[in-house]
Design a protein with these regions (language model features):
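Short catalytic-loop micro-motif centered on adjacent basic/acidic residues
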Residues: 41-45, 144, 196-201
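Acidic two-metal-ion nuclease catalytic site recognized across multiple nuclease folds
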Residues: 172, 283-295
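Gly/Thr-rich phosphate-binding beta-strand-loop-beta motif of the actin/hexokinase/Hsp70
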Residues: 135-162, 279
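Mg2+-dependent endonuclease catalytic cores in nucleic-acid-processing enzymes, primarily RNase H-like
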Residues: 49-63, 69-71, 77-79, 88-92, ...
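Conserved RecA-like P-loop NTPase helicase motor core
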Residues: 274-277
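Short, glycine/acidic-enriched loop or turn micro-motifs at the edges of active sites
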Residues: 9-10, 149, 174, 204
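ATPase catalytic-site recognition across NTP-hydrolyzing enzymes
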Residues: 77-145
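Signature of the SF2 helicase/ATPase Hel1-core->accessory helical subdomain module
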Residues: 2-76
Length: 295
């Protein structure tokens, strides 16, 4: 048996639309993948429009045994196959094509690859983290909450665990649900990991969120008001995030949504949502103030 998908996206607009991309990913995971039989080979074919498209997510999760990337023109600027299109014909196409479209449609470089800030994150799987944790107990946990204040924003939560002077991001929340859902969810996360302290950004809805959260958890909730420009804060914290933090890939939708939001963040500022990177920036600042010996 072989399961094949081919060009799930009509074009760049589909791949860069959160709504369309989520719908395609949901169809792939539920309708398509539910038809797999034991031992079924799986082949996904398509243009690499976005880091967050179906193929991009699967590559990040290391689902594929092998990935074959065919660029229209090689590093020497020659056609990959003169019988398909000659080098001169590709050169003419490149002149008439927007650079980001050329890179994605012809060179298989996702349009959101250029300008990625968090391009060197460190990951471990859930199983790998559990193996580490077997012989090395968690010494303490802190958390950070970036509260949604607009309809398109996400409430983002990250939990950081300290093991032998190493920082592991062990749990995540990334949701547009209302506070009647997100506050109990956050409280449950904090209690699950026995988080000692959690900062909540108090801008806008954050103050109300933190007060209600404190009534539902044993964790000490600390409000923080950020005055620094968000993008500046994210960029300034990025080195610490990449150098000092290891991200546990739990395999659930929340963690993958959070991680993909971080990976797709562009330092050039073309971001539909930057809630997860903003959450990590806040967590990074908090970690460095709490654990000066780890910084």
């Amino acid at each position: 048996n072989v399961a094949i998908t081919d060009d799930l996206y009509r074009g760049i607009e589909d791949a860069l639309s959160d709504t369309v991309n989520d719908r395609i990913n949901q169809w792939k995971e539920s309708t398509h993948d539910s038809r797999f039989e034991s031992g079924c080979a799986r082949i996904d074919i398509g243009t690499r429009w976005s880091l967050n498209d179906v193929i991009g997510r699967n590559m990040e999760s290391k689902i594929y045994d092998k990935s074959i990337i065919v660029s229209a023109m090689n590093e020497e600027g020659q056609s990959f196959c003169e019988d398909v299109l000659t080098t001169d014909e590709y050169i003419e196409k490149k002149k008439r094509t927007a650079p980001e479209i050329w890179e994605a449609e012809y060179q298989q470089q996702p349009v959101d690859m250029k300008g990625r800030l968090f391009n060197e994150l460190k990951f471990v799987s859930k199983d790998e983290f559990q193996e580490i944790n077997k012989t090395n107990p968690i010494e303490g946990c802190i958390g950070y909450v970036d509260v949604s204040d607009q309809g398109t924003d996400y409430t983002s939560v990250a939990i950081c665990a300290v093991i032998k002077k190493q920082l592991f991001i062990v749990d995540y929340l990334m949701t547009r649900d209302n506070t009647d859902i997100t506050i109990p969810q956050t409280a449950a996360m904090l209690d699950k990991w026995k988080v000692s302290y959690c900062r909540v950004e108090s801008n806008s809805m954050g103050a109300m969120f933190s007060r209600q959260l404190q009534t539902q958890t044993k964790t000490r909730i600390l409000q923080v008001h950020n005055t620094q420009n968000k993008i500046t804060r994210i960029i300034m914290s990025s080195a610490h995030v990449m150098n000092s933090m290891t991200f546990v890939r739990n395999g659930d939708n929340q963690s993958e949504l959070f991680i993909q939001n971080v990976l797709s963040f562009s330092k050039e500022g073309k971001n539909k949502n930057d809630d997860a990177p903003d959450c990590l920036a806040g967590l990074s600042i908090f970690v460095q103030s709490m654990f000066k010996n780890l910084s």
